[in-house]
Design a protein with these regions (language model features):
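Substrate-binding/catalytic cleft of secreted carbohydrate-active enzymes
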Residues: 50-54, 62-220
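Secreted/periplasmic carbohydrate-active enzymes, especially glycoside hydrolases
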Residues: 1-72, 81-85, 121-122, 154
Length: 220
């Protein structure tokens, strides 16, 4: 029987993500983990290694696994090669009592199962309000995201949790904003006044605002 371990520290100070107490700029590729012939299942361990090597060769230092809990072999090789991973949960189709129950149980199982992989540096339970479509104003959905945040932190207080990646944040350790604008000039103009976006004075993406109603930006 063989095993391994890795040591690293992820922290946030003064608006910056630190790796081992040093500012670290994350160049992450959004990776949906599809394979040509086997779909969501990696065809082989060699294919996983080749995928990670290509990611590194293109200049990325990490991946945001999108809507997929990845094979443990992928996480192992990211541990070995020093590639960072944002671990994101697949979204429920809609918000209801059954979805809340199943999502909570499955998400906590995932956090506990993958807790010891040093490559994972951020937990992302929700993405772009998928499965919580009315979280911007619906108090029940907001409370659900708060509960998931605190349950995650109770298991793992050491990693950042981005509760709703992209927009309409409730409680979150990092304010992440998704923007699909293709014009650099428009992009520059839009983000010239950061305070207008973080205060919900203007939306950054169509009708999507940075914060959900009733929540304020705290510098995260």
């Amino acid at each position: 029987v063989h095993s391994y371990f890795g040591l690293r520290k992820i922290s946030i100070q003064k608006g910056k993500v630190l790796l081992n107490n040093e500012p670290f700029y994350q160049r992450l590729i959004l990776d949906q983990g599809y394979w040509t012939d086997s779909h969501l299942t990696p065809p082989s361990e060699e294919a996983i290694i080749e995928d990670i090597d290509k990611i590194m060769a293109m200049g990325y230092n990490g991946v945001r696994k999108h809507q997929k809990i990845e094979d443990a072999r992928f996480l192992y090789w990211c541990d070995v090669k020093g590639v960072l991973v944002w671990s994101e949960m697949a979204a429920a189709y809609e918000f209801n009592d059954q979805a809340v129950d199943r999502f909570t149980r499955e998400w906590l199982d995932i956090v506990q199962q993958h807790y010891n992989h040093p490559c994972i540096v951020t937990w992302v339970p929700f993405n772009e309000s998928w499965g919580i479509a009315n979280v911007f104003a619906d108090r029940k959905q907001q409370q659900f995201t708060e509960a998931i945040y605190h349950l995650t932190k109770s298991i793992d207080p050491y990693r950042p949790v981005v509760v709703n990646d992209g927009w309409e944040h409730t409680v979150s350790d990092i304010l992440t904003l998704h923007d699909y604008e293709e014009s650099g000039a428009k992009f520059l103009k839009r983000y010239a006044d950061k305070d207008a976006i973080t205060s919900n004075e203007i939306s950054h993406m169509n009708a999507r605002y940075a914060m959900a109603q009733g929540y304020a930006y705290r510098g995260q």
